[in-house]
Amino acid sequence: MIKLMKYLKKSAGYIVLIIALLFLQAYCDLSLPDYTSKIINVGIQQKGIEDSVPDKLRDSTLQNLQIFMDEDQKKEVSQNYTQEDDTCLLNDDISKETRENLNEDFSKAMMMVAAFSEDSEQGQAMAAQMGLPEGTDPLTALAQMPEEAVQQIMSQVDERLKDMPESIVTQAGVSFVASEYEALGKDVDAIQMHYILMSGIRMLAMALVIMLAAISVTFISARVAGRLGHDLRNSIYRKVMSFSSREYHKFSTASLITRSTNDVQQVQQVMAMMFRIVLYAPILGIGGVLKVLNTDSSMTWILGVAVGLILIVIFVLFQVAMPKFTILQTLIDRLNLVSREILTGIPVIRAFSREKHEEDRFEKANLDLTKTNLFVNRCMTFMMPIMMLIMNGVSVLIIYSGAHAVDNGTMQVGNVMAFIQYAMQIIMSFLMITAMSIMLPRANVAALRIDEVLKTEVSIQDPETPVHPSESVKGEIEFDHVSFAYPEAGENVLTDISFKAKKGQTIAVIGSTGSGKSTLINLIPRYYDVTKGSVKVDGVDVRDMTQKELRDKLGYVPQKGVLFSGTIDSNIRYGKPEITDAQVKEAAEVAQATEFIDTKPEKYESPVSQGGTNVSGGQKQRLSIARAIAKDPEIFIFDDSFSALDFKTDSQLRKALKEYTKDATTVIVAQRISTILGADQIIVLDDGHMAGIGTHKELMANCEVYQQIARSQLSEEELA
C-alpha cells in the first residue's frame, strides 16, 4: 500500500482536511463521557453545584468561614466578593485560577464550620470541654479564642484531611453551599435541573458535531479514494498500452484485467475505509488513554491487560491467516483465466463434447478459491467474539474495582461510568483496526500486484533523441542480417534475414506453419526488437524512431480480425477519424465490404458488438482490411489476412488492392500461393531461415521449398 501513496499527492489538501475533521470528531467523542460523569457527579450527587465557591452567602456565614482562614485567604475572599445588604455576592469576572484558589480556601473552612457547629457531635464535645453554657455556639467561642489556638486546631485538622479522599472534601463543601442556598431561599432543585439541562444540550451539540464530521469524512474519503482508483486505472492502462509483446506475455490477459479492475477496487475500498477507521482509531485510542489517566490512574492496569490480550489474539490469527491472503488474488486470477477460456471457447467445447471436462476445470478453480476464502473467513469469525468477550470482561472488572473505590470514597460514581466509556473507546479503536486488518492484507497483495505492473520495465522505448526519416524516402523497408529470438528462448526464430522493399512494391512472405512468417512482420512495427541486425523503415532503424511516428506510417491487418464495439463506420475510421464519408465508402469498396454493408438496414451505422461477434469471420476480416486502407499509410502489412475469404472475394480484393496501393509498399503473409503469385518479391521461410527470395517464376526454378508448397496447392497447369 505504501508504494501507491504517491498517487495521493493530488489529494493532499483533502487528506489534511480529513485528519482535522477526525481530530474534531475524536475530541467530541472523548468529551461525551466527561459530560456523563459531570451529570452524575455534579448534576445528580451535587445538585448542580460544581464546587465549594458559593455565588452568594450571608455575612454571618462568611464570618464563621473566615475563622478558619489565614490573612491571605481572607484577603483573597474579600477581593472577589461584593457586599450587598447582609449578603456577599461573588464577582462575575473572576478567572478560572482564582476560582480554584477560592474553592481550596472554602472547602477546608466549610468542613471546619460544619464540624464545629452546635448541631454536630464535635461541636457539642468542644462546648463541653470548654465549659460553655448550653445553647452557646462553639463557633462564637472559637472566634473569641487567640489566633494561635485556632491555628493549632487547624493543624490537627490538616493532618486528618491529608488522609481523606478529595471527593469527600468536595462533597462536604458542596453540601455546605447547598445548605447556604436553602437558607438564602434559593431554589436548589432549579439549579440542579438547569445544570443537567445545559449539560444535555452541550452533549447534543457534541453529538451533532460528531455526526457532521463523520459525514464529511465519509464524503471526502470516498472522493479521495475514487480519485485514487481513477488514477491507478489510468496509470495501469497507460503502462499496459506501452508494453511490448514481451511484457504482454509476462502477464496473462486475465491477470491484467483483474489487476486493473478487481485489484484497484480492493485498494480503493480499503483506502476509503482507512481514512475513516485506520486514521481515526489511533487518535481515539491515544485520546482515550490520556483521558483515563486524568480520570483515575489506579485502574489503568485493566486497560493494559485488555490491550495485551487483543494484541495476542490479532497476532495468533494473522499468523494463521496471512499466508492464505497472499494466494487469494492469484486464485482469483486463475478463476478469471478459466472463465475467460471457457466463455471464448464455447463453440469448440460443444463441438468436441468437452463440457464435462471444462466443468471440472472450472469447479476445481472455483473450489480452490472457495476453500481459501472459507479458511480466511473462519479464522476471522473467531476475532469478533473474542474481542467482545474481552470488552465485556473489562467492563465487569472496571465495575468491580470502581465499586470498591466508590465505597472507599476515593472515586465518584460518575468517574467510574466515564472510565468504562473511555475503556470501551480504547478497545473499540483496536476493534476498528482489527476489522480493517481483515481487508488490509488482501488489499496489500492487490497493491503489490498493481505496483508490479506499474514498475515493469518496458523493453521497447522511444529513443532520447529520435531520428526523423527523410521526406524524400517513403515506404521503404529493409531487413539487414536480422536474427531474432524470443525472450528467454534458447534458439533463434529468425536467422540472418536480409531483403529490401521499395515504394510501390509488393513483398510476400510464405512458408510452412511455424517458420516465422508472423514474427518477421511483427518486427516492422517494432512489437519486438531484433536480437541481431537491424530493421529500417524509410532508411532509419526503427529503434531510432519514435513508436508513434513509425506506426503512423503503417496500415496493419492482423492474422485474426479484431473489431471494436461501435459501428461499422467507427471501425473503418479507427486509424484516421477525420476522413470523409466518401473515403470511408471507398475503403469499404476496395476491401469488398460494401457487399454485406449495403444489405444492412443501417448500412455504415450498423452496430458492431464487442470483438465483432455479430459479423462473420470473412466480414470481420474485410472490415479490418478497410480500416487499414482508410488510414492511407505508406506501408500495408497483411498478416495472412485473406485466409477467411473465399477465392472469388480474395481475387476481387487483391485486384482492387493492387490498384489502390500502387504508391505504397505492401507486405503480405500468406498460406495460399494464389494470393501472392503477382508479388514483386516472395520471401520463402523454412524453420526461421530464408530458403529463397524472388518472383514466383524465379522461385519455381531455383527454390525447392517453394516448389513443394506450390505443387501441394496448385496443379501443373496452374503453375505453368
Predicted regions and their residues:
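Membrane-integrated ABC transporters
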Residues: 1-32, 36-203, 209, 213, ...
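ABC-type nucleotide-binding domain
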Residues: 15, 51, 66, 71-72, ...
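An intracellular "coupling" helix at the cytosolic face of ABC transporter transmembrane type-1 domains
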Residues: 146, 153, 245-246, 262-271, ...
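Helix-loop-helix
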Residues: 287, 291-308, 312-314, 318-319, ...
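Short intracellular "coupling" helices and adjacent cytoplasmic loop segments at the cytosolic face
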Residues: 44-51, 58-65, 70, 138-146, ...
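Extended hydrophobic secondary-structure segments
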Residues: 217, 242, 249-278, 300, ...
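Residue-level recognition of pore/gate-forming positions within transmembrane alpha-helices
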Residues: 22, 207, 277, 281, ...
